[in-house]
């Protein structure tokens, strides 16, 4: 008689994904972030669902409803801060997950990688529309500035912006549709995450050495279920420390003021996880050029499989590429800092140089390093 988990139509799927999945024996803690992203998504959907029960998507009452959640709803303050900081946790895990993919050459699984890029775009869209919902000063002006960027698109730009706004400015119609988008997008992300996993399990996981490990794979359970569970516990510990001790550390003080279309904040900036892209956008004086650079800063990831020149998959034994990878990470941290600074010297030139270095590293330096390493190894 076969075991039920191996024969039952539904349990069979779960079994193939979480129990009997053949997994490389040497994957490190950096491979935990996929499951941690799943945990973050579930956390965000659950906290978001409870917030949606008390939130009203109307310009007159949106700000008050968030205040009501924090003051009058049982543990509303906790749910609200878990949701707000959960977005930061999500992006920390997401960026580490992408960084691991670049470092160990996981982008060579093209289908999985491209679905991942689509997931990144959708997550960024979800976070952006969600940031508008509390209807504070930075919410309102952030929505105005970022949606206005679409007006740079030739010919249809202005019509497109007014179509998204549902009027001639960011108003009630905009808030209502942003709430609708913010509610539905996480479920689309969850469905795409399943497709992401489906494509990954077609090829099997990569490993730090970047070599085939079919001959010595081990079952996912109990080895990696235990390892993932440890990751979840550690991350929740850090996350709850942030939520309970420093809930407003990553937020903007301007969002504690209700949205006022007649008063512009001195420095409009998005949440910290978008600052690197915002810095790239601002580094180009031309509006359309800035928008193109902004989109390309993320879309450039899709080129990585085609820019891979090394005969080795992973960067584990490629010191030249490793150095460039850490230069790229440092550059992104620099761009994140610049994105939060006002547009004045010396920040303008630093932002422009950091933006050039970002594109130069990915498009030119990393492929060149791969070729040089091949030459040095006489491959």
Curated annotation (Swiss-Prot):
Heme b b566 binds at residues 97, 196. Pfam families: Cytochrom_B_C (PF00032), Cytochrome_B (PF00033). Binds 2 heme b groups non-covalently. GO terms for molecular function: metal ion binding; ubiquinol-cytochrome-c reductase activity. The chain crosses the membrane at residues 33-53, 77-98, 113-133, 178-198, 226-246, 288-308, 320-340, 347-367. It is found in: Mitochondrion inner membrane. One of its GO terms (biological process) is mitochondrial electron transport, ubiquinol to cytochrome c. Its cofactor is heme b. It comes from the Eukaryota. The keyword Cell membrane does not apply. Heme 1 (or BL or b562) is low-potential and absorbs at about 562 nm, and heme 2 (or BH or b566) is high-potential and absorbs at about 566 nm. Belongs to the cytochrome b family. PANTHER family: CYTOCHROME B. This is Cytochrome b. It comes from Thomomys monticola. The gene is MT-CYB.
